[in-house]
Amino acid sequence: QPRSRGLGDVYKRQAVYGNPQRSATGFDLRRMNMLLAVLEKRVGFKLAQKDVFLNIAGGLKVNDPAIDLAVISAILSSNMDASIEPEVCMAGEIGLSGEIRPVNRIEQRIGEAEKLGFKRILLPKHNLQGIDTKKIKIELVPVRKVEEAFRTLFG
């Protein structure tokens, strides 16, 4: 059962044969493998023996590292069979040590999230510096590490 809310699909299966399959359509496979390694090391999810298929909907190819946080959240959601609240969105680049790095054009991203009706946005804590929060209606949820984002999304 995919967990995507129409934004793409992530499927996970237990591999009962040889090496697990990894597939990414519209997203860099090497980057996905790096994100899977970070999930194993920092959050403790054992994904080494599971198949992971990632598909970005609509035939889009996404190279923006700001999608990293959304990708790992979708993978975790599928692995745990737990939904992410539909009014939550996120932006953040993930580093090798699990840190959530700042992204470009954060105010523009926040504005677009508001226009699309999102109520909360997870974003890198470092991106809060210099943002005029008085005009922002969406709840800003700053996170520093992957583990923190995981706790925020899944309790």
Predicted regions and their residues:
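Peripheral, non-AAA+ core regions of ATP-driven protein-machinery
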Residues: 9-155
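Short, small-residue-biased leader/transition segments that mark boundaries at the very start
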Residues: 1-10
